[in-house]
């Protein structure tokens, strides 16, 4: 019997102000863990899988139950330690220490590969935490929508003079992360054709308003795109098909999209990518009997897809890797020029990282959408001179369906995160918000990740693989008083290719929270400015000087 599978489970986080735990500092991680497994949030909640192939919230259901039990009895001077989804210890610390410290999927570098991890996973000794799955701050597909939107806006500026009308994006994957592409693309003015082999995922994106239409043939999908472009109104289409098949077929037909990318779960060839010609049932059966065959076939199909992406790039498409390590997989299968198209961070996002700008997110623990709408208004009030941000918040309210507890994401940087958070804390204190909020972020941020094929690709000084930075980030956030801090390996791009840290803090309206919030949400983005200044980026150096950061080697 698989202790990770229980179809009888239906997890819904409590709403309102009644506590199940001894304070909001422990109620918050409990609700957010539960929210990660909400049926409208998680990809496979019955298996504890939140997103990203096998990214889990807890190692198994026994561990989940025990985590909840411990959080409900945890005192405000105690800290729970979670090792790869398993609660392993409670220790006396102090009131400003994190209530939970999490380490997920971390392996000694020589053994940091999928083969060794999968053996540990089978033995029940490890859990793949992805980024926000095992760190309990996943907010559904919204969590990556704005970052994807910002990327597509940058693509339009760089390649099409800012004009996206009448243009379309080809991509693959409509899972928890990939599902953002369709909505983000149409928000940015593009039509989007997204290939997905799992029809339930397309239907899920239709239900949550991330996809406009479903197609079952390439001809049908292309007709939908053409009709929308002729009408000047962008549309998103979920095509039930294998991305490798579709990408190669478009090359064969001589049909060139304007933009090409991919967000299949290529980072995990065993569990995340369906080989060409295979059904999902066949793949599921083969994973139990011949893992090596599945991996080989999946990587061979990735090679086909990447070759097609290169061919489409040659034909004129703006082509980018969206951080799932598909280029690496294809390179290992003999596609020697797999890295000829860039990753999205060095191509479009790094200037934002240099100012500590990244995916700031918050969640209303009350469960009341009005709390989010009030914080939206507060963001506009405190940042009045950013029409791009205001436009994002307006579009988000109009077009993004909340999944689980109401949440919002917006990309802001060093100069704004702490003051926004302090304002939210004050809103809780004076009763404007009906309950506390938690503030966190993706591990994809400016100072919290080392990932040479994604966030730290092509660093100016060649420090792509130096992973001291996320370790320092986690240590500093712990010292600063975050409510929970996490340190993971392998998120986004798979085992052996990344290390990254997460942080969440509770705004409960107290003066003590204000002090913690002020420290954490200044120091956290400041480490990103520090990291990029150290690598030699002038934008980061200037930001550090303007914000008064004490960086000894930058004097």
Swiss-Prot record:
InterPro entries: Urocanase (IPR055351), Urocanase-like (IPR023637), Urocanase_C (IPR035401), Urocanase_central_sf (IPR038364), Urocanase_CS (IPR023636), Urocanase_N (IPR035400), Urocanase_Rossmann-like (IPR035085), Urocanase_sf (IPR036190). Pathway: Amino-acid degradation; L-histidine degradation into L-glutamate; N-formimidoyl-L-glutamate from L-histidine: step 2/3. It catalyses: 4-imidazolone-5-propanoate = trans-urocanate + H2O. Pfam families: Urocanase, Urocanase_C, Urocanase_N. Its cofactor is NAD(+). Signal peptide: none annotated. The active site is at 410. It is found in: Cytoplasm. NAD(+) binds at residues 52-53, 130, 176-178, 196, 201, 242-243, 263-267, 273-274, 322, 492. Binds 1 NAD(+) per subunit. It comes from the Bacteria. One of its GO terms (cellular component) is cytoplasm. Disulfide bonds: none annotated. Catalyzes the conversion of urocanate to 4-imidazolone-5-propionate. Belongs to the urocanase family. NCBIfam families: hutU, PRK05414.1. This is Urocanate hydratase. The gene is hutU.
């Amino acid at each position: 019997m698989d202790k990770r599978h229980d179809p009888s489970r239906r997890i819904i986080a409590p709403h309102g102000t009644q506590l199940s735990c001894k304070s909001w500092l422990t109620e918050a991680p409990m609700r957010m863990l539960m929210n990660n497994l909400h049926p409208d949030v998680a990809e496979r909640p019955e298996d504890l899988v939140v997103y990203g192939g096998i990214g889990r919230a807890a190692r198994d259901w026994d561990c989940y139950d025990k985590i909840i039990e411990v959080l409900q009895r945890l005192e405000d001077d105690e800290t729970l330690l979670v090792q790869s989804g398993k609660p392993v210890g409670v220790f006396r610390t102090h009131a400003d220490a994190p209530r939970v410290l999490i380490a997920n999927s971390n392996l000694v570098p020589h053994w940091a590969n999928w083969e060794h991890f999968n053996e540990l996973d089978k033995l029940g000794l490890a859990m793949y935490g992805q980024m926000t799955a095992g760190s309990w701050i996943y907010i559904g597909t919204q969590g990556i929508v704005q970052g994807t939107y910002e990327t597509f806006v940058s693509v339009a500026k760089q390649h099409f003079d800012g004009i996206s009308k009448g243009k379309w994006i080809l991509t693959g994957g409509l899972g928890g992360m990939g599902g953002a592409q369709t909505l983000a693309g149409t928000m940015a003015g593009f039509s989007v054709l997204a290939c997905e082999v799992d029809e339930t995922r397309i239907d899920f994106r239709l239900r949550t308003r991330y996809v406009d239409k479903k197609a079952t043939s390439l001809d049908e999908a292309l007709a939908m795109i053409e009709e929308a472009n002729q009408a000047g109104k962008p549309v998103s289409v979920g095509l039930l098909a294998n991305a490798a098949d579709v990408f190669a077929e478009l090359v064969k037909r001589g049909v060139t999209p304007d933009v090409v990318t991919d967000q299949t779960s290529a980072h995990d060839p065993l569990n995340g990518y369906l080989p060409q010609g295979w059904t999902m049932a066949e793949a599921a059966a083969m994973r139990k009997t011949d893992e090596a065959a599945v991996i080989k076939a999946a990587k061979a199909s990735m090679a086909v897809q990447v070759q097609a992406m290169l061919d489409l790039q040659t034909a004129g498409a703006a082509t980018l890797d969206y951080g799932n390590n598909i280029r690496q997989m294809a390179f290992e299968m003999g596609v020697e020029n797999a890295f000829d198209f860039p990753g999205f961070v060095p191509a479009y996002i790094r200037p934002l990282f240099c100012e500590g700008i990244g995916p700031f997110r918050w969640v209303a623990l009350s469960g009341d959408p009005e709390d989010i709408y009030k914080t939206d208004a507060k963001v506009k009030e405190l940042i009045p001179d950013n029409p791009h941000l205001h436009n994002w918040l307006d579009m988000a309210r109009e077009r993004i369906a909340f999944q689980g507890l109401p949440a919002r994401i917006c990309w802001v940087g060093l100069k704004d995160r702490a003051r926004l958070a302090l304002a939210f804390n004050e809103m809780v204190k004076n009763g404007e918000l009906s309950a506390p909020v938690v503030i966190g972020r993706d591990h994809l941020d400016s100072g919290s990740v080392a990932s040479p094929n994604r966030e730290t690709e092509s660093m100016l000084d060649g420090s792509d693989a130096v992973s001291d930075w996320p370790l320092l980030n986690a240590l500093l956030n712990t010292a600063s008083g975050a409510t929970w801090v996490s340190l993971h390996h392998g998120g986004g791009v798979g085992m052996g290719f990344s290390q990254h840290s997460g942080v969440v803090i509770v705004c409960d309206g107290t003066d003590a929270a204000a002090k913690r919030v002020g420290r954490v949400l200044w120091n956290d983005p400041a480490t990103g400015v520090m990291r990029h200044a150290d690598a030699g980026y002038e934008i980061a150096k200037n930001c550090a000087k303007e914000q008064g950061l004490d960086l000894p080697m930058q004097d």
